[in-house]
Amino acid sequence: MNHSEVKTGLIVTAKQTYYPIELSNAELLTHYETIQEYHEEISQNVLVQSSKTKPDIKLIDQQPEMNPHQTREAIVTFLYQLSVMTRVSNGIFFHAVRFYDRYCSKRVVLKDQAKLVVGTCLWLAAKTWGGCNHIINNVSIPTGGRFYGPNPRARIPRLSELVHYCGGSDLFDESMFIQMERHILDTLNWDVYEPMINDYILNVDENCLIQYELYKNQLQNNNSNGKEWSCKRKSQSSDDSDATVEEHISSSPQSTGLDGDTTTMDEDEELNSKIKLINLKRFLIDLSCWQYNLLKFELYEICNGMFSIINKFTNQDQGPFLSMPIGNDINSNTQTQVFSIIINGIVNSPPSLVEVYKEQYGIVPFILQVKDYNLELQKKLQLASTIDLTRKIAVNSRYFDQNASSSSVSSPSTYSSGTNYTPMRNFSAQSDNSVFSTTNIDHSSPITPHMYTFNQFKNESACDSAISVSSLPNQTQNGNMPLSSNYQNMMLEERNKENRIPNSSSAEIPQRAKFMTTGIFQNTGELTNRASSISLSLRNHNSSQL
């Protein structure tokens, strides 16, 4: 046998054929009509299961090594890159992150085992769903082998791939992933078939993006073939007379062709809008995995926030495809919080996510539009805060002006006769009517407070201190006639009894300390007791007797 006659094995030359669009549409329509009968029961079951499997953010915050505020962005980014490299289908990444959050709610995750945990979560999610999130596909035997479409072929990552991408055989081996899978299943009580966010966001026909892209290509081919046919038609009619050309322009077939072109353009625009909508929904679903604060909300609340963003920036009227809980409508505060979290997530989109979605139709313009909206919103908030601050300053200034004017009109002094405060002296402007003056002024000055002059009183203080203004009795009663001397002595004894020495009424009273004869305390004539703003330390009673 010659070498050329040796068979090299089976050579597959068959090509995948496109899945018939008519067949997929008929299957989807049948499924939609059948499922409507159980729509309420399905919606209620999804709400119960999603609430049951919701991660506990309070327990996740207690992770000693994997603090979510510091490590979530890095670990979710690694998990997303791992899902892209292993080519799992749409929705598996979100499901894997959900497994990781639920596991962190019950177990402590060590930092050197984080990649092992998230890799196992991705492997478990791919096997749970089979990568087939479409009614046409089957979990065991998905479409895609013979046909191209209606969605990508299901793929489960191999253990060798997970070992390679998670650090190599020096860190992990295949048996460690198998052991971790069993450990995660035991931790989650084998309750791994939980509702997905795709059940709220994506309709059954929106899961087969390939079908829409194929239909778009067919329309483009038909349009190109139509243009070629029109060019041939023009070349054939170039030999006609002018009258024949004019009749051809004014004839009905030409107008019918214009209507056909308009219909085709509208159909293309509608198809592009549908493809853009599907891409936006997938982008927001993947983006939500990075937003740790979204774990505080229910699944349907997150979906409402996503639809509010889609409707705002695409001018559409979209809503969840499952029923909302009865009597528990989302309040405006919750919707505002979710909206703000997602907007901030879009503005700060992870580079790895943008790198994958930048080729998708409508994603980059959407991100730029959201960034412009956020920038304008920040400017408005800054302007509003500035205006509010200006108003507060104006109100405060008017308030102080009114107080100043009312105080200057109602009373000439800020101090009343019953106050116990001693004002500081104004050195810059000498006043005859001051605390330190020796002349008696009947009327108070509008600048200096009204103080009482007094005679020399016998001090019975134990520490031989000077008599202060606050300890002196008022010579008048409520501004009326002067009181009698007996009454004054009674008042003095009553007020000065705390300064008396017990059982020593006949004790010798030391001499009073005199002010210095220089500086601002210099007095002429008879010495009178004046209250000063500075407390003078005087000699004690024992030293005065020596």
UniProtKB/Swiss-Prot annotation:
Gene3D superfamilies hit by this protein: Cyclin-like
BP-aspect Gene Ontology terms: cell division; G1/S transition of mitotic cell cycle; regulation of cell cycle G1/S phase transition; traversing start control point of mitotic cell cycle
Superkingdom: Eukaryota
A GO molecular-function descriptor: cyclin-dependent protein serine/threonine kinase regulator activity
Keyword DNA damage: no
Pfam families, A to Z: Cyclin_N
Region of interest: Disordered: 224-265
Keywords: Cell cycle, Cell division, Cyclin
A single GO cellular-component term on record: nucleus
Keyword presence, Nucleotidyltransferase: no
Described purpose of this protein according to its UniProt entry: Essential for the control of the cell cycle at the G1/S (start) transition. Interacts with the CDC28 protein kinase to form MPF.
Additional record remark: Present with 319 molecules/cell in log phase SD medium.
Family: Belongs to the cyclin family.
PANTHER family: CYCLIN N-TERMINAL DOMAIN-CONTAINING PROTEIN 1
Name of the protein described by the UniProt record: G1/S-specific cyclin CLN1
